[in-house]
Amino acid sequence: MISFVSGRVAAVTPDSVIVEVGGFGVQLLATPATIARARVGERARFATSLVVREDSLTLYGFADDDERTVFELLQTASGVGPRLALAMLGVHSPTALRAAVATEDVKALALVPGIGRKTAQRIILELKDRLGTPSTAAAESTSGWRDAVHAGLLNLGYTARQADEAIAAIAGELDDSAAVDTATALRLALATLKRP
């Protein structure tokens, strides 16, 4: 197993980060929040999980060990593969996922594309005792999301002006909430940029 990858960020795509390691470009599929923190040309370290299939080897990258642990635990639920687990982490932070499972919040889990009511109920049933309880200290700050979203939009090819306008458009909605999930903020910002 490859536990982590450390090196210079060579490129960023909408769904992955490419890290130069020993002359090789290693592609890591990642969540929007993880991608938003990666800056081309700078050194970075990603916790990783290698998923081996009959026809492929896929490396998934995460901001920290906790995110990787939740990713791997999510896959122990029936019907949840690596793509769906990554989508769940793209919509909710590890803390938010733990809270949703602990409080049996079917609606929160059903916000993830590919998860309906029955799948959400099954995930809650199978993971309630294994996923752990949410940590209140791990909630993201309300101001930190702005920098992460700005960096993410710049890495995706948007100008600084476009990034600032998108952040301004969603700021009123997000600053009212106690904890802002970076992935959600980035998704909302991208949605404002795609409007005609």
Curated annotation (Swiss-Prot):
Q: Which UniProt keywords apply?
A: Cytoplasm, DNA damage, DNA recombination, DNA repair, DNA-binding
- Major subcellular site: cytoplasm
Provide the residue span(s) of the region labelled Flexible linker: 136-140
> Which Gene Ontology cellular-component terms appear in the entry?
cytoplasm; Holliday junction helicase complex; Holliday junction resolvase complex
Name a GO molecular-function annotation: four-way junction DNA binding
Q: Where is this region: Domain III?
A: 141-196
Function, in words: The RuvA-RuvB-RuvC complex processes Holliday junction (HJ) DNA during genetic recombination and DNA repair, while the RuvA-RuvB complex plays an important role in the rescue of blocked DNA replication forks via replication fork reversal (RFR). RuvA specifically binds to HJ cruciform DNA, conferring on it an open structure. The RuvB hexamer acts as an ATP-dependent pump, pulling dsDNA into and through the RuvAB complex. HJ branch migration allows RuvC to scan DNA until it finds its consensus sequence, where it cleaves and resolves the cruciform DNA.
Domains: what does the record tell us? Has three domains with a flexible linker between the domains II and III and assumes an 'L' shape. Domain III is highly mobile and contacts RuvB.
This protein's name: Holliday junction branch migration complex subunit RuvA
Source lineage: Bacteria, Bacillati, Actinomycetota, Actinomycetes, Acidothermales
